[in-house]
């Protein structure tokens, strides 16, 4: 039973590594782990420390968010500046423009239909 649990854990870990982009790069947060028993090494898999290796790999894939003390910022409300605008803002404005265009087109169609009804009733 214990071997089956390890096999399932290993399969889940391999799937996680395949799904995460940049799997060959190590994060600086994970490289800064101070506890030598948690450091990953190629021989760590064979030492029975599978749980430790898994935790370290998860720490590499999903680093903790750096608090204000780690980045050296003065207040907790400050955020580091991003060079590139976020994709969500671009997507939001794109969707907003598209919806406005659709609403404008629908409004023009309704107005044209109302004008056609008026001209038909007047007899022009």
UniProtKB/Swiss-Prot annotation:
The record, for InterPro entries, names: Corticotropin-releasing_fac_CS, CRF, Urocortin_CRF
User: In the record, what terms sit under GO molecular function?
Assistant: corticotropin-releasing hormone receptor 1 binding; corticotropin-releasing hormone receptor 2 binding; histone deacetylase inhibitor activity; neuropeptide hormone activity
Alphabetized Gene3D superfamilies for the sequence: 6.10.250.1920
Keywords in alphabetical order, please: Amidation, Cleavage on pair of basic residues, Hearing, Hormone, Secreted, Signal
In which tissues has expression of this protein been reported? Keratinocytes in epidermis and the outer and inner root sheaths of hair follicles, epithelium of sebaceous and sweat glands, erector pili muscle, cutaneous blood vessel walls, cutaneous nerves and dermal mononuclear cells. Detected in plasma cells in the lamia propria in colon mucosa (at protein level). Expressed in pituitary and adrenal glands. Detected in plasma cells in the lamia propria in colon mucosa.
PROSITE patterns hit by this protein? CRF
Propeptide residues are 26-82
Additional comments on file?
A: Positive correlation between increased expression in colonic lamina propria and severity of inflammation in patients with ulcerative colitis.
**Family named by the database record:** Belongs to the sauvagine/corticotropin-releasing factor/urotensin I family.
Annotated region (Disordered), positions in chain: 23-46
One GO biological process term: aerobic respiration
Q: What does this protein do?
A: Acts in vitro to stimulate the secretion of adrenocorticotropic hormone (ACTH). Binds with high affinity to CRF receptor types 1, 2-alpha, and 2-beta. Plays a role in the establishment of normal hearing thresholds. Reduces food intake and regulates ghrelin levels in gastric body and plasma.
Which cellular compartments is it found in? Secreted
**Which residues are annotated as modified residue Valine amide in the UniProt record?**
122
Question: Would you indicate the residue range of the signal peptide?
Answer: 1-25
Which species does this protein come from?
Homo sapiens
Q: How does it assemble?
A: Interacts with CRHR1 and CRHR2 (via their N-terminal extracellular domain).
Question: In the UniProt annotation, what is the result of changing residue 122 to A?
Answer: Reduced affinity for CRHR2
**What protein is this chain from?**
Urocortin
- Which cellular component appears as one GO term in the record? perikaryon
Q: Which domain of life is it from?
A: Eukaryota
């Amino acid at each position: 039973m214990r071997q089956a649990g390890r096999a399932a854990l290993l399969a889940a870990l391999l799937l996680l590594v395949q799904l995460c982009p940049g799997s060959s790069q190590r994060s600086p947060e994970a490289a800064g782990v101070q506890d030598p028993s948690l450091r990953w090494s190629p021989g760590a898999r064979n030492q029975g420390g599978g749980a430790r290796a898994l935790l370290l790999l998860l720490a590499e894939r999903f680093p903790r968010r750096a608090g204000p003390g780690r980045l050296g910022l003065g207040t907790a409300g400050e955020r580091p500046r991003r060079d590139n605008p976020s994709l969500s803002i671009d997507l939001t404005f794109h969707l907003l423009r598209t919806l406005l265009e659709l609403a404008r087109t629908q409004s023009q169609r309704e107005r044209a239909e109302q004008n056609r009804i008026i001209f038909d009733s007047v007899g022009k």
